[in-house]
Amino acid sequence: MRRWMGLFLGCATLAHGEITRHGGGDEALPDRQYVHVVSQAESPVMQTWIKAKDGVYIAAAVRKPLSSKWGNGPFPSLIMFHGAPGGRGMDQLVGWSRGDHGGPVWERFLQEGYVVVVADYRGGDWNQMNRPSSTGLVTAIDDGITVIDYVQNLPYVKRSDVSVYGVSLGGNLAMYLASRVPTLHAVVAGAPAPIWFLGVKLNPDGSRPDLAKAELDPAVVRENIAPIRMPVLILVGTEDRLMPLDIMLHDELAKQGKAVRLEIFEHGYHDFVLGNQGQERKDLPRGEILLPGALEALELTLKFVREPK
């Protein structure tokens, strides 16, 4: 705790960064009142296959906001990238898009007039797939760029108002997309695992190092952060082992003068921002629950994506 507080107090003074810590309870809220709130008859899930750079197809679940309330567009859009592993498949994406498991995020943006795209990306070898390749290998980063290009060119989407929200490993992807797609409106990294984005080396056996003592690669950090133009929002919980790394991510963005905010939520477990995703989590005694902090983070995220700053 002492080490973390030192990091917190130190980075809170950075000129271009902003860190806020949120309190709140750890009770499990009933989640069913927050899901299935948008008519699937009026806003059906469109199962979409997007051709990737190498000819394979990327699954995406797309929903448009209600025309009875929002008209026919063009609409702003939020593209959401899930956590590990890549290659979840269409059924999983559709379930998330509908809020079938209790997570409120996807439908909340739909309620506010956003085209919500829940997109997949390829899995595979961690080190090969989760950073750009210099050998021509098509990676998850290429898939993310392809999805953004597809969404930006949809006739009912406002091209200049497309944002990305990535969680966990999807947060690593989101940061690479912030670096490589300057036309994005805003980028949100929820409980991100920016291991490759920051040049952190895995252990020789492929396992994750102690992230509280992680050593970043300064050259990789500079190269990846320098091109970023849009504001970035980072969300993490105090019970998440990735918190030290996410503080480092905030610090590095702030050092390079980027517009970045870090919001830290008491009691937040890894991926708490999405609530129940329908996953078996042996690391969580109560399983995936909807925390008060998740709802606070959701409304904060919605406000940020509307007006990034």
Residue ranges and their predicted role:
Residues 21-73:
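N-terminal cap/lid segment of alpha/beta-hydrolase-fold proteins
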Residues 241-247:
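Conserved alpha/beta-hydrolase "acid-adjacent" motif
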Residues 171-217, 221, 225, 275:
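Hydrolase active-site cap/lid region
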Residues 259-309:
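C-terminal catalytic histidine-bearing segment of alpha/beta-hydrolase fold enzymes
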Residues 69-75, 83-126, 242:
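Short substrate-entry loop that stabilizes the transition state in hydrolases
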Residues 228, 234-236:
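Short beta-strand/loop motif that positions the catalytic acidic residue
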Residues 157-168:
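Alpha/beta-hydrolase fold nucleophile elbow
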